[in-house]
Each structure stands twice: as structure tokens, then as C-alpha cells.
Amino acid sequence: MEQPPAPKSKLKKLSEDSLTKQPEEVFDVLEKLGEGSYGSVFKAIHKESGQVVAIKQVPVESDVQEIIKEISIMQQCDSPYVVKYYGSYFKNTDLWIVMEYCGAGSVSDIIRLRNKTLTEDEIATILKSTLKGLEYLHFMRKIHRDIKAGNILLNTEGHAKLADFGVAGQLTDTMAKRNTVIGTPFWMAPEVIQEIGYNCVADIWSLGITSIEMAEGKPPYADIHPMRAIFMIPTNPPPTFRKPELWSDDFTDFVKKCLVKSPEQRATATQLLQHPFIKNAKPVSILRELITEGMEIKAKRHEEQQRELEDEEENSDEDELDSHTMVKTSSEGVGTMRATSTMSEGAQTMIEHNSTMLESDLGTMVINSEDEEEEDGTMKRNATSPQVQRPSFMDYFDKQDFKNKSHENCDQSMREPCPMSNNVFPDNWRVPQDGDFDFLKNLSLEELQMRLKALDPMMEREIEELHQRYSAKRQPILDAMDAKKRRQQNF
């Protein structure tokens, strides 16, 4: 793969002259890197300096207040452990946010590409930089609120930087704690889920979960429905490693200090930087081998995809010349072949192969944002806003509607019959209203086993029914709000 030219001078901030030009005059966009919060992220070169940057292109119809908040927080940050912000452009219907480029990608990308979890030494080195980033943010009275391996980026030298401030928040003197449920379900601190108010140490809980994620490939509860996890995190004891005997006492103790359920007793970033597991961390040079390996795999896959696209185009041209083409006589068969090819490619990655729940449900949850205002880069809670009766974490599942609908439209022959059918469970299997379970004594062992086996699917069905009822109540309110906003704009 062709290497970008060496930078002529280090880019610190885009000049006023650069910001008045069209972005295409200032940058050469090279390739798409992936999806961030609210938009797609591209790799580009700043023409004047030759420096590689990342550009997040955000559709204007996205939540503009959240985007402005992300830019505001990034603008205020100046730390080698936080992704730098260079400037923004409006281009047609997109906002272009120009940021520091981290060539190795996220920690979760590297785990996926290599199909390997990280060693203790690698984890300690990454956590040391991450804690320095959190110490800086928390000193600035900012909460990241979405710490996970996917939001810790590595540059090619191995330096870890915090990224994706789409859901970050600002603490002020007049607001000691926040009450909004924001983040990604499996990484959330108990106090965030319970909406009892939280502060900077909520990020420390998420860091503890991230430590387990880096060691085991996925966070605790990743194999179960996120709604169930949301109920389990505040009530269950703090999670631990699946096989504690594989990990050192120092690492186990570090995770234990992060995952203290009481926020008052949880360690701070500054305290954790003095923990033996972090103090004994090795230099970033130990990460170069895994970074090189991950980048080589990524480049190889990119070349394979390009070849496949070229082959498909050639085959398509040949098919058009053939009067009895496969596409014409058996288009469904071709579709099935492509689906199988995609599945086999996905199976090469550990997380996609082992946990479909993880792939589909780890999106970032943003709740109650209507109750927050942006004012001079500072987030403030509106104390006069009416109490919301709806459990706020239900909003996260509204975001999954599109994915769920697309799954429903999948070819039925490619999957087992759905166990969520309304006809699967008799009504008399539901929990008795009076709470009297004495009737269970009269059932046979086989009937009891069937009931036990059916509990999880029944729960899934009831959760889905509850979600649908809330969605039906919520949509008219959203429609009315949209109508009012449109009238105000027209006025």
C-alpha cells in the first residue's frame, strides 16, 4: 500500500484562510475508516502540511446539539492522551469535523483483526495512557461517559488516546452530579443506570469493564440481552474475570478497585495511576508488534475486497453477454452464495463469530438529552423539566428498531424458527398475579424443566411487548414536537 508523504510541518490548528475554503481544496480524502457517533470517519491528507488527519462527516439532519457539544469539548482539550481537534467545515448537507488521525485504529479493532485478546503487559500499557487521558478530562470537570475499547485509539507508535466525545458531559460548580443515562449498556456504572446522579468516577467503572473486555474479548453480560444486563448490573455483585486464575494478583486487584459499586469508595484516575499494575507498565514500544500485525491484516483484507469487487464487475459484464445467465434464471441462488461468503469472512473474527448479541447491541445509548442544554460549551441540567415516567434506558432499544426490522426480513430458511412467537407459550405459563407458586409442586420434573427452559424466551417476548407499547406512546409525542419545531422554523 502506498505510504503518505512525510508531514512538512506539524498541524496544530487549521488557519482562518483554510477554514474559508472548500474542504476539498484543503484536504485529499483517501478512504473510509468506519463509523463514529453520528457520522462516517474518513482518512485524509492536509495538502499544505502533508499531515494525515481523520475527518468525521456528519449529516446536518443528525442531532446538531450533540455534534456541537462534541466539538466544544474537543476544542477545550489539549492533551497528548486525547484526540486533537483541528477545525470544522460545512459542505452541502454535511458537517466535516477534522481531527487527529490514529493510524492503528481502536483497541477493539486490533482485537478483532488479530482474532486475539491482549496480554497483561499490553493491557497495562494501554490503561496507563487511558488513565492519563481520564485524569486530564476529570481535572477539566468533564465526563467521557462512553469509555470502552472501541473509543480508545492507538497511533502507529502505540500511544493510546481517548476519542468519540459524542456523549461526553461537563460538570459545573452548580451541578455536582448528572442524572442522565448515557453510554453503552454493558460498560455502564450502576449509578448511571439507576439515575441516582453520578460524577467522573462513572468513567472508572467503565474502564474496569474495558479491562475485562481487552483481556477476554468482550465485556461481562455481552452474551445476554442488553435489557437484562441493565437490570443485572445494579443488583449483581461486581463482575470479575471468567477464569481468574489466568490473571495476576495486581491485574485482578486493579479491576476490583475500578468495579466498586459505591461511587464514593471507587478509586479515581489519579489514584489508579499509582496502582502497582499501572506503575509497572512497560513502554509503548511493546505495542508495536500487535499494531503492525493488525495493520497488515487490515491492508490484506482491503486488497482482497478490492479484488472481489473487480471480479464481481468482470462477472457482471460476462453475465450481460450471456443470454442464459445465472442472474436471470436463479437470482436467489446468487444471493444465497453471497450471504454464505459474507458469513465465512465474519467467522474469521473472534467477537463477530462468538457473540452475535455483542455485534448488534453495543451501540452508544444517549438518554434524556432533551433535558440538557448547551451553553458556552457547558452542559446544564434543566431542573424544571417534568419527571419522565418512562424508564429512560428504554430509548436505547428504540435505536435497535431498524436492526430488528431488518432481521425480521431475513430469509427464514437461513435461521431457526423464532422462539418469540405469541403461540409458543400457553397463557397459564405466565407468572400468577397473586404470586402463589404452590401449583408447581404438582407438576412433573419434565414439565418443570420445560418451564425453566422457556423462561428466557418468555422474558424476551415480554420485553419486546413492553418496548412496543412504550414506542406506541412515545411516537405521537415526538411527532407533535417535530411539528412544533417546523412551525417555529417556518415562522
Curated annotation (Swiss-Prot):
A matching Pfam family: Pkinase
Role noted for this protein: Stress-activated, pro-apoptotic kinase which, following caspase-cleavage, enters the nucleus and induces chromatin condensation followed by internucleosomal DNA fragmentation. Key component of the Hippo signaling pathway which plays a pivotal role in organ size control and tumor suppression by restricting proliferation and promoting apoptosis.
UniProt KW Nucleus keyword: yes
Family note: Belongs to the protein kinase superfamily. STE Ser/Thr protein kinase family. STE20 subfamily.
Cellular compartments annotated: Cytoplasm; Nucleus
Names of the cofactor(s): Mg(2+)
Xref: PANTHER family: STERILE20-LIKE KINASE, ISOFORM B, STERILE20-LIKE KINASE, ISOFORM B-RELATED
Annotated Mg(2+) binding sites: N151, D164
Residues in SARAH domain copies: 437-484
Record-annotated active site: D146 (proton acceptor)
The protein's name in its UniProt record: Serine/threonine-protein kinase 3
Chain spans, region Disordered: 301-343, 370-392
PTM (free text): Autophosphorylated on two residues Thr-174 and Thr-180, leading to activation. Phosphorylation at Thr-117 and Thr-384 by PKB/AKT1, leads to inhibition of its: cleavage, kinase activity, autophosphorylation at Thr-180, binding to RASSF1 and nuclear translocation, and increase in its binding to RAF1. Phosphorylated at Ser-15 by PLK1, leading to activation.
Occurrences of domain Protein kinase (ranges): 27-278
Site, as annotated: Cleavage: D322, S323
Keywords: Acetylation, Apoptosis, ATP-binding, Coiled coil, Cytoplasm, Kinase, Magnesium, Metal-binding, Nucleotide-binding, Nucleus, Phosphoprotein, Serine/threonine-protein kinase, Transferase, Ubl conjugation
Phosphothreonine: residues carrying this PTM: T117, T180, T336, T378, T384
